[in-house]
Swiss-Prot record:
It comes from Polistes dorsalis (Paper wasp). The keyword Secreted applies. Expressed by the venom gland. Its main location: secreted. Most of synthetic analogs show a decreased antimicrobial and hemolytic activity. This is Mastoparan PDD-A. GO terms for molecular function: toxin activity. The modification Valine amide is found at residue 14. Keywords: Amidation, Antibiotic, Antimicrobial, G-protein coupled receptor impairing toxin, Immunity, Innate immunity, Membrane, Secreted, Target cell membrane, Target membrane, Toxin. One of its GO terms (biological process) is innate immune response.
Amino acid sequence: INWKKIFEKVKNLV
C-alpha cells in the first residue's frame, strides 16, 4: 500500500 498515493488522493479531495 502506498501511503504517499493515499495522501495525494486525500489532498485532492480537500
